[in-house]
């Protein structure tokens, strides 16, 4: 189980990303439309003004049950070992074990 503080921090990052999403998108559009380099630098400074944690690259996908940030399956929202346990216990309908 992940620490509660890490899960809370990730939720805070998600809120910040939603809040500053439009500002980042509009700044990126402005940069691509302006040909002069000096104007691009000014807009680039505006792009750096939002907090670091509002950048979408800082977000992690976390396991729904444990909060684990690694080895997540997007389809289920679970980490690998929890997914395996749930499939073995027949808790995920439609998921089957494979053996070869």
UniProtKB/Swiss-Prot annotation:
Location relative to the cell: Plastid, Chloroplast
Database matches in Gene3D superfamilies: 1.10.287.1480
InterPro entries documented for this protein: Ribosomal_uS14, Ribosomal_uS14_bac/plastid, Ribosomal_uS14_CS
Any one cellular-component term (Gene Ontology): small ribosomal subunit
Tagged with keyword rRNA-binding: yes
GO molecular function, one term: rRNA binding
Major site of localization recorded for this protein: plastid
Signal peptide annotation: none
A biological-process GO annotation: translation
Keywords noted in UniProt: Chloroplast, Plastid, Ribonucleoprotein, Ribosomal protein, RNA-binding, rRNA-binding
Pfam families: Ribosomal_S14 (PF00253)
PANTHER family (alphabetical): 30S RIBOSOMAL PROTEIN S14, SMALL RIBOSOMAL SUBUNIT PROTEIN US14M
Family: Belongs to the universal ribosomal protein uS14 family.
NCBIfam families found in the cross-reference section: PRK08881.1
Function per UniProt: Binds 16S rRNA, required for the assembly of 30S particles.
Subunit and partners: Part of the 30S ribosomal subunit.
HAMAP family: Ribosomal_uS14_1 (MF_00537)
Identification of the protein by name: Small ribosomal subunit protein uS14c
